[in-house]
Amino acid sequence: MAENFHILLLNGPNLNLLGTREPDKYGNTTLADIVSELETQAQALNVKFSHLQSNAEHVLIDTIHQARGNTDFILINPAAFTHTSVALRDALLAVAIPFIEIHLSNVHAREPFRHHSYLSDVAVGVICGLGADGYQYALQTAVKRLSTSN
């Protein structure tokens, strides 16, 4: 049953500035708007949903470690840590919780240094370039995968 599932959303550095930061790339939707929409969607899907945004890599890693044993799926927009953080990758592998990597912009249509991800090859999937809607698609996919695997 979906009501037993817990899905954790993690957002990395600078995503607290959504809505005002480079709206041509990231849109005008704030992170609070995205989270509010996901909370509504999670309630409709009858799943527990929690969220954390941090600009600090160690906070995201500690949160991933704490998710072990009580979280069924992670949705993560690692932001700039996508391209730099082996530690974030190792944390996700260590807890063995399935996850979807999310990006608001199409990272493959941007600067070459953004084309590499330390997470995508170990993620269930990657959603990029679909703006805030990508988060909703990720949540729907996580619930569907959990529902069909149990």
From Swiss-Prot:
Q: Which PROSITE patterns match?
A: DEHYDROQUINASE_II
What reaction(s) does this enzyme catalyze?
3-dehydroquinate = 3-dehydroshikimate + H2O
Q: Which Gene3D superfamilies match?
A: Dehydroquinase, class II
Task: Name the Gene Ontology molecular function terms of this record.
Answer: 3-dehydroquinate dehydratase activity
**EC class (word):** lyase
Pfam families hit by this protein: DHquinase_II
Keyword set for this entry? Amino-acid biosynthesis, Aromatic amino acid biosynthesis, Lyase
Pathway(s) the chain acts in: Metabolic intermediate biosynthesis; chorismate biosynthesis; chorismate from D-erythrose 4-phosphate and phosphoenolpyruvate: step 3/7
For site (Transition state stabilizer), what residue positions does UniProt give?
21
Q: Which GO terms describe its biological process?
A: amino acid biosynthetic process; aromatic amino acid family biosynthetic process; chorismate biosynthetic process; quinate catabolic process
Q: Does the keyword Zinc-finger apply?
A: no
Q: How does it assemble?
A: Homododecamer.
Q: What function does this protein fulfil?
A: Catalyzes a trans-dehydration via an enolate intermediate.
HAMAP family (alphabetical) = AroQ
**Which protein are we looking at?**
3-dehydroquinate dehydratase
Give the source species.
Pectobacterium atrosepticum (strain SCRI 1043 / ATCC BAA-672)
Organism placement in taxonomy: Bacteria, Pseudomonadati, Pseudomonadota, Gammaproteobacteria, Enterobacterales
Which gene does this sequence derive from? Answer: aroQ
